[in-house]
């Protein structure tokens, strides 16, 4: 790329470009030139690859051809969306001077910087998903983490204590852009993440952070926000706020507070648990067949985003949960009336953010007006609902009659996309604007009258009056009649078959019309800006209303889901345990064509661990996951897929279900499995719900069985967590005999020949066999292989008859059965050479063996 070392060698325009580019060296610069945004040098080469646009050359500057690429200004949003999705940031440089009055290059400046984490434009955002900017900080005591959704003003910070908790937060929030200090130590935590931005250390200084935050919120200290004693979180928040101010280059009135997220307030789920439970993303990275795909029938984008936040942060405050349950119950008979009205509210939350940033477009204001028009009907529908929480939401929604009437007066019904196109402000709102418009709009009548008058006066039937953007107004006469044009007709343009003229009267009117159009557009822009000034003082109340409407949408949605899917209202208990009657998996039951087999579950202080056995594909993993999902739904305040549920305190949910090689980090399947297991054993408590599936299968049989046994023992005896432990190691079914609080359950199956029928029904006691060969046959393994496997199984079973006898039907071997001691008689016989014995010695050996037996 050309540098600014020798600016004099460049043209004035390129000098201007290079100075601006030097201020933004690491991001693309969109440089406005007329109707295009141009990119030069390395930016042009990079953009041509990222956007698949042509790379050309523009003359020369400093003796070298200039690589150039460009995009039309009217299509800029589409190109920005592509770049943002690839993690790129773009500085938008606009012409702010008037080309008509400027000598040399038109004055330009960067008016905004578009980054993946700070976008607010509707075209760039996914409407049903939060778009977060985050900052991470680390010192010897732990991590600081802050997130901001600039499209709503939601500002959060936390202080994860360790690497695992920090990893879980990164997965939960999934930021579009992540700021980190240049000396950040745990680089493996953030490697491969999108939108990484390295920031200087001074941006994370605690004193600077406090000053920035107090300035933003208009406060003297941060005590009122409950974050005063969170120095690591504040360091991250300070850097984040500085970055937003640098990129947005405007005030941020919608960012009014900051909230501390504390671990003790919510059920903690690590990264593996969130992945395995497929809450909002399935294991393949998509959104099909996830919990959210079943539960999310919200009718507003902001409601959908709130529901997903609830799913990822289940709360432990039962007062909040009971209030949500009561609201859902009260709304179950009203959702058919409420949802069509709520649907009309749209994404008020993000419209308000654009209003705060002063980037709201005319159609945003029209949508805002439409949202406010729904409030009277919503308030009327909720007025007689006998529920205090519902009435609280109704009050928070507000009415905003004056603002609604203002927008009804000010903005036309279907405004254009951009205010610069004109025609946004409604007739009657401004008398002066109406006068300028009347003058401009009167041109059509005048031109029609002029055309008729001149045609009749001159007797020229080909005479027409018209207008184009290049030559302005003109009188056109065909080539055949052009010799009849009067002398005061001044030729303006010659065409193949016609001549175009101007007359003093038409020129005078043209100047008048163009002046009136310009005046009307300028006044309209001024009135539009004044609308912002009238709306922004009400921003805080409008944001409260948007939040209440989003929450109402979530709760109405949960009421509809509960009714439609036959969910029950769970009850909370102070005693540890989970009791589920006829529980179902919320996702699997929607996918299955046949009826889902519901199953019970009971975990209590005297029954803290269930050893779950049964065939592959028998439903063990489904049974375990449905328990976790029922608990998760209960702790967001939702109804749950069961006949009856009683649930005690839960502080964490852990899952160790399935694994795959982590090739990027050089970790095998077994290493991944053991890392997740170690995390559980270190962090689980007696109030944790733990799902352990097939521990130890990634190593040798004896190693795996020993590890599984020891893990189960530790969870049951030492940690005393509520545990579902699925295994194919039949030896673990002996655990209930050796320790208290452990019970066996199994999933039933019926085998007939080489076929197997899975009953998916949970029964007390251990499974009689694993049905592994039957499942292999079902999977299509060749018959000769199955036949050979059966032969080998019989051989293995015959080797250990004692172990086989301990099983119900002798089809499983006990690997931990004590090895038989070799008999002294056998040892003596092994050392005997019968061919060397005399008859007398042989007789003596018989008596000796008799004594050894």
Swiss-Prot record:
Keyword entries, A-Z: ATP-binding, DNA damage, DNA repair, DNA-binding, Nucleotide-binding
Cleavable signal peptide: none
KW Secreted (keyword) present: no
GO MF annotations in UniProt: ATP binding; ATP-dependent DNA damage sensor activity; damaged DNA binding; mismatched DNA binding
Gene3D superfamilies given in the database record: 1.10.1420.10, 6.10.140.430, DNA repair protein MutS, domain I, MutS, connector domain, P-loop containing nucleotide triphosphate hydrolases
Cellular component per GO, a single term: cytosol
Binding residue positions for ATP: 614-621
Any one GO biological process: mismatch repair
Domain of life (superkingdom): Bacteria
Cross-referenced SMART domains: MUTSac, MUTSd
CDD domains per UniProt: ABC_MutS1
Its biological purpose: This protein is involved in the repair of mismatches in DNA. It is possible that it carries out the mismatch recognition step. This protein has a weak ATPase activity.
Protein family per UniProt: Belongs to the DNA mismatch repair MutS family.
Protein name (record): DNA mismatch repair protein MutS
Organism, scientific name: Klebsiella pneumoniae subsp. pneumoniae (strain ATCC 700721 / MGH 78578)
The gene coding this protein: mutS
């Amino acid at each position: 790329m050309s540098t600014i070392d020798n600016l004099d060698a460049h043209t004035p325009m390129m000098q201007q470009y290079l100075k601006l580019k030097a201020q933004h060296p690491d991001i693309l610069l969109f440089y406005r030139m007329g109707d295009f945004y141009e990119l030069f040098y390395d930016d042009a080469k990079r953009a041509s690859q990222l956007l698949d646009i042509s790379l050309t050359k523009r003359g020369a500057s400093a003796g070298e051809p200039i690589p150039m690429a460009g995009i039309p200004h009217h299509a800029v949003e589409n190109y920005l969306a592509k770049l943002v999705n690839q993690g790129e940031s773009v500085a938008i440089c606009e012409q702010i001077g008037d080309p008509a009055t400027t000598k040399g290059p038109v004055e330009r400046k960067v008016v905004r910087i578009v980054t993946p984490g700070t976008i607010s434009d509707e075209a760039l955002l996914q409407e049903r998903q939060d778009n977060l900017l985050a900052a991470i900080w680390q010192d010897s005591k732990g991590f600081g983490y802050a997130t901001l959704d600039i499209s709503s003003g939601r500002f959060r910070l936390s202080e994860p204590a360790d690497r695992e908790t920090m990893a879980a937060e990164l997965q939960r929030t999934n930021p579009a852009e992540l700021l980190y200090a240049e000396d950040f130590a745990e680089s493996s935590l953030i490697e491969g993440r999108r939108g990484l931005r390295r920031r200087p250390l001074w941006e994370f200084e605690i004193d600077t952070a406090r000053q920035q935050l107090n300035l933003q919120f208009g406060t003297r200290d941060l005590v009122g926000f409950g974050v005063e004693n969170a120095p690591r979180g504040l360091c991250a928040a300070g850097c984040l706020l500085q970055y937003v101010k640098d990129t947005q280059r405007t005030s941020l009135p919608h960012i009014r507070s900051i909230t501390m997220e504390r671990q003790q307030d919510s059920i903690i789920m690590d990264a593996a648990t969130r992945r395995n439970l497929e809450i909002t993303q399935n294991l393949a990275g998509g959104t099909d067949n996830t919990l959210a795909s079943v539960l999310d029938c919200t009718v507003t984008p902001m409601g959908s985003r709130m529901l997903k936040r609830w799913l990822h942060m289940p709360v432990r405050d039962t007062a909040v949960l009971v209030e949500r349950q009561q609201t859902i119950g009260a709304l179950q008979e009203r959702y058919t009336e409420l949802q069509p009205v709520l649907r009309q509210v749209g994404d008020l939350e993000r419209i308000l953010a654009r209003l705060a940033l002063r980037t709201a477009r005319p159609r945003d204001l029209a949508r805002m007006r439409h949202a406010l028009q729904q409030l009277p009907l919503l308030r009327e529908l909720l007025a007689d609902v006998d529920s205090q929480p519902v009435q609280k939401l109704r009050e928070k929604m507000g009415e905003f009659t004056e603002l609604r009437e203002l927008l009804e007066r000010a903005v036309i019904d279907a405004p254009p996309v951009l205010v610069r196109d004109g025609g946004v402000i409604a007739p009657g709102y401004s008398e002066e604007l109406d006068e300028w418009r009347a003058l401009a709009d009167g041109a059509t009548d005048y031109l029609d009258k002029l055309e008729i008058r001149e045609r009749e006066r001159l007797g020229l039937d080909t005479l027409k009056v018209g207008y184009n953007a290049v030559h302005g107004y003109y009188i056109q006469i065909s080539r055949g009649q052009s010799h009849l044009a009067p002398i005061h007709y001044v030729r303006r343009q010659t065409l193949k078959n016609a001549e175009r003229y101007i007359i003093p009267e038409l020129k005078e009117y043209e100047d008048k019309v163009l002046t009136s159009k310009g005046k009307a557009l300028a006044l309209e822009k001024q009135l539009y800006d004044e609308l912002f000034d009238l709306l922004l003082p009400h921003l805080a109340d409008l944001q409260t209303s948007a939040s209440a409407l989003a929450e109402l949408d979530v709760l109405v949605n949960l009421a509809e889901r509960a009714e439609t899917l036959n969910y029950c209202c769970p009850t909370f208990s102070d005693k540890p345990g989970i009791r589920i009657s006829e529980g179902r998996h919320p996702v699997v039951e929607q996918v299955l064509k046949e009826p889902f087999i519901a199953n019970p579950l009971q975990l209590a202080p005297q029954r803290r661990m269930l050893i779950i056995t049964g065939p592959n594909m028998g439903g063990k993993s489904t049974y375990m996951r449905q328990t976790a999902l029922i608990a998760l739904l209960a702790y967001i305040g939702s109804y749950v897929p069961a006949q009856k549920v009683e649930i005690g305190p839960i502080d964490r949910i852990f899952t160790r279900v399935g694994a795959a090689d982590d090739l990027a980090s050089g970790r095998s399947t077994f290493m991944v499995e053991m890392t997740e297991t170690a995390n559980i054993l270190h962090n689980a408590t007696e109030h944790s719900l733990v799902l352990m599936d097939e521990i130890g299968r990634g190593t040798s049989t004896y190693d795996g069985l020993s590890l599984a046994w020891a893990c189960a023992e530790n969870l049951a005896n030492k940690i005393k967590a509520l545990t579902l432990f699925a295994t194919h190691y039949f030896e673990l079914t002996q655990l209930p005999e050796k320790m208290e609080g452990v019970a066996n359950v199994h999933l039933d199956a019926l085998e007939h020949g080489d076929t197997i029928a899975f009953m998916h029904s949970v029964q007390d006691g251990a499974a009689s066999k694993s049905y592994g060969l039957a499942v292999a046959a079902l999977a299509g393994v060749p018959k000769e292989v199955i036949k050979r496997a059966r032969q080998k199984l019989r051989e293995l079973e015959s080797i250990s008859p004692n172990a086989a006898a301990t099983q119900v039907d002798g089809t499983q071997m006990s690997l931990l059965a004590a090895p038989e001691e070799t008999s002294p008689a056998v040892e003596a016989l092994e050392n005997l050479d019968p061919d060397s014995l005399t008859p007398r010695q042989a007789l003596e050996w018989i008596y000796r063996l008799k004594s050894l037996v």
